[in-house]
Amino acid sequence: MTNMDLLHKVDMDIVKEVVRICDAHGLKYFMLGGTMLGAVRHGGFIPWDDDIDLGMPREDYEKFLEIAPQELPSHMKTVNYRTDRKFQYYITRVLDTDTKVIEERIGNENKYTNASIDIFPIDGTPNNKFKRKIYFFRVLYHRALMSLCYKDSIDRKRKRSFKEKVLLWVMERIPVNKLTTPYKQKCKIDKLLRSQKVEGSLYIGNIMGAYRTREIVPAEFYGEGKFYPFEDIELRGMADADAYLTFTYGDYMQLPPEDQRKTHFKILEIHGQTVAEE
């Protein structure tokens, strides 16, 4: 088994437990981003992708965070900024503590972590177009400040627009850590996101994903969801996956150039056994 195969197997073990808990408690989840793309284009993982992204409507997300710590197996746990102030992200991860990995895009001691899958809250947005743009600006402003508190973890290899490059250059020269903390910014983001209910919103989604506002889509794309084959199981995804993937990725069936096929994690140890370098 390759390192990637091992990581995929661990990720599948985690996602099966998450789905089991959701099904037992009537909680709704959806595949998001590259996981939804992988299901449609590859019937499972994108071959070079090494994580799974699920989203839950805010109410179900909060219930999951309450229930999961008692129901996950002993070697799995949830972590987010509420349970650990040093946790780098706003979202929740479900970890397999028996599997140690290195998160290669992080440049500090936080890069040593456990195999995991990501759980995102799905929130609404203002229905008024102008108010929605203001809302996006406010959330992304606090997200940028949060990221700049972790300057050694900014993904500098990622493809960015000229405007984004200029903004990053300017903001990197501001002593952000003297003005705020990442925890404060996460709390502000949380307050903004919680203020917008899914019910009644024309556009919903996950602005904290890699594609930011491109992951905010018409609510009917989600609908009640639909099941898609994913490796050896079926997972719930968008009711209209084609519309969602086109909105987010454009020509999603076109494979990206090889230099843009990024991995995030590498297994170092599993069940106490060191994994040999490939």
Question: Model-found features: residue ranges?
Answer:
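Active-site nucleotide-donor binding segment shared across nucleotidyl transfer reactions
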Residues: 19-52, 56, 61-62, 220, ...
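Glycine- and acidic-residue-rich phosphate-binding/metal-coordinating active-site segment common to enzymes
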Residues: 139-143
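A short secondary-structure junction signal
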Residues: 129-135
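Conserved catalytic core of two-metal-ion nucleotidyltransferases
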Residues: 2-23, 65-127, 146-249, 255-278
